[in-house]
C-alpha cells in the first residue's frame, strides 16, 4: 500500500512539473534587416547599430536563436551582419531568395528561387539546414508536395511557427512617424506590442490543450525588434519560459500555425484588425 501511495505522489508531481515547464524557441525571419539602407554612411551606421542591438539582446539573454535569410535582400555590407550573427553562435536558415508566396507562385518558380538562395547561402547556412516558408504559405496539395520533395532532397528541415507575433504590422506604423520621433513612438507602442505577443502565446498554449509541448515564436529582424527584443525576452522569462533551440523545440513542438488552423481561428477572432491584415495576404 505504501508503494502505491508513493507511486501516486510521484506521478502527480511529474504531471505538475510537466505542466509548469514552458519552453520557447526564438526564430527571426527576413534577415539581414527589414527596411535597412546601406547607401550612405549615416544609413549604414544606423543599420549596423540596429542589427547589433538584436545580437546583444539574444546574447545577454542566452537565447539560442535561429535566423532566416532572404538571400536576395542582402545589400552590400550586410553580409557582415550575417557573419556576425553566425559567429555569435546563432543558427541561420533559408527563407528563399525573393520571399515569394507559394499560394501565388508556381511550385517550379518557387523551387528555383529556394535553390538560388541555397547556392548563395551555402557558406552561411548552419547544420541542420532549416527552411521557413515566407508568409507561412505552403500552397495547395500539389505544390506543397513538390516543394517538400525538393526540401527533403536537399536535406532541409521545415521550421514551423506556433506563435506568430504579427510584428510587421506594428513595424509598418513606425515608418509613418517622422524619423526623429520614431524611437519615442516605439516606446509608446511597446505595451500594446508586448501584450499582443503574449495574447498570441496564450492562444498557442490553448491549442496545445495542456500538453507539455515546446513553442516556436516568429518575429522579424526589423527596427521594432531592434529596440524591443530585450523586452520580449524579459516578458517570456517573467512568465516562466526557458529559451531553447529550434532543434530542441522540434523534438516535441506545439501545434503549428497552418492554413486550415488559421482559417478556423479567423472565425473566432474577426474583431482583431491585426489578424484581419494577416488573413488578407494569405490566399490560394
Listing of model-derived features with the role each one plays in the protein:
Residues 19-135, 235, 251:
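Active-site beta->alpha N-cap acidic-glycine motif
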Residues 75-77, 84, 101-242:
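Catalytic domains of cell-wall/extracellular-matrix polysaccharide-remodeling enzymes
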Residues 59-61, 160, 211, 221-284:
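C-terminal domain-boundary segment and adjacent tail
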Residues 1-4:
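Positively charged n-region of N-terminal signal peptides that target proteins for export
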Residues 6-10:
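Hydrophobic helical h-region of N-terminal Sec-dependent signal peptides
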Residues 13-15:
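N-terminal signal peptide c-region/cleavage motif recognized by signal peptidases
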Residues 69-71, 162-163, 247-248:
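Acidic carboxylate-rich catalytic motifs and surrounding loops in phosphoryl-/glycosyl-chemistry enzymes
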